[in-house]
């Protein structure tokens, strides 16, 4: 046998041995556990914690549309001093230095996966529900930890407390518009606070349809409470309803909140101004 054939035979033998050494069923793409932390936070404020119902979080595979994880963010709002008052480098953790609300899950990934992460909240206040999302590339086994994937929600939580929605207003009467103003995390807006109302635009409006009848100056009354007086003009004789709107916005209007209530109007002859008596609230009809 020539030297050439001997070499070829040796190479074939070595190749066969190496092939036999690697199991034919070996799977190099087995799923690997990949922890992921997501935090839904209020813009320029803190995490959406249990006090506002937390936030709904969904992680979805961008390519397939499959939901990889879903649940609710739980926990406390966080440490205000560390989050709002302590200077941080851009790369330093802020929300995870001390405990704050988050959503934690463990995904099983077998390849680099582009995901869409969606957060919605605050769940306790559906009338101001906000939504934010990000696309993030996750790598199998690379844990997303620390502050995690941060989703920031813009807006303010505004709620008109008085007049109550069940009380008609009388033409010619004076009244007081009172509302609470908070960040979406439930954090209190007040003068000289972490969320300084002096740097915000807060006011009320008396409205007839789309027309502003009166702009109402409001003043701080208590923690997160602002109030101002209004008067319903007698010129509205014959009108059936009137609306009060409370508007709140931060300095550059990145965060805005509005609440509006429409009230039945009673004629001047039945008003408090004319009768000297409070107008009775609307009594809901009894069920049959």
What is each stretch, according to the model?
Residues 38-49, 180-195:
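Short amphipathic, basic-aromatic surface patches that mediate peripheral association
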Residues 231-238:
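Short, surface-exposed loop/turn segments at beta-strand-coil junctions that are enriched for proline
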Residues 137-189, 268-288:
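Short, compositionally biased P/S/T/A/G/V-rich stretches that sit at domain boundaries
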Residues 78-103, 222-230:
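Aromatic sugar-binding surface patches on proteins
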Residues 111-115, 238-244:
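Exposed beta-strand face motif in extracellular beta-rich ectodomains
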Residues 109-130, 249-258:
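Short acidic/polar inter-strand loop motif in beta-rich domains
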Residues 9-20:
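Bacterial N-terminal signal peptides
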Residues 49-56, 192-202:
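Short coil-to-beta strand junction motifs in C2/discoidin
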């Amino acid at each position: 046998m020539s030297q050439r054939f001997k070499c070829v035979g040796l190479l074939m033998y070595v190749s066969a041995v190496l092939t036999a050494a690697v199991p034919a069923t070996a799977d190099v793409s087995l799923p690997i556990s990949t922890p992921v932390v997501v935090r839904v936070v209020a813009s320029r404020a803190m995490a959406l914690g249990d006090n506002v119902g937390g936030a709904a979080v969904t992680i979805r595979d961008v390519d397939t549309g499959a939901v990889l994880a879903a649940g609710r963010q739980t926990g406390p709002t966080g440490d205000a001093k560390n989050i709002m008052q302590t200077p941080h480098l851009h790369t330093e953790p802020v929300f995870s230095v001390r405990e704050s609300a988050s959503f934690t899950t463990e995904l099983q990934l077998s390849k680099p996966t582009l995901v869409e992460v969606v957060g919605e909240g605050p769940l306790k206040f559906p009338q101001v529900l906000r939504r934010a999302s990000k696309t993030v590339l996750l790598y199998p086994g690379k844990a997303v930890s620390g502050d995690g994937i941060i989703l920031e929600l813009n807006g303010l939580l505004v709620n008109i407390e008085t007049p109550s929605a069940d009380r008609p207003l009388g033409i010619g009467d004076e009244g007081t518009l009172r509302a609470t103003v908070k960040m979406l995390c439930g954090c209190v807006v007040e003068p000289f606070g972490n969320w300084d109302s002096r740097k915000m635009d807060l006011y009320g409006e008396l409205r007839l349809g789309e027309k502003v009848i009166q702009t109402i100056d409001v003043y701080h009354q208590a923690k997160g409470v602002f109030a101002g007086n209004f008067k319903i003009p007698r010129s509205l004789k014959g009108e059936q309803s009137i609306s009060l709107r409370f508007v709140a916005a931060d300095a550059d209007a990145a965060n805005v909140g509005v609440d509006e209530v429409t009230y039945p109007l009673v004629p001047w002859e039945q008003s408090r101004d004319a009768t000297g008596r409070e107008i009775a609230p609307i009594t809901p009809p009894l069920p049959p």
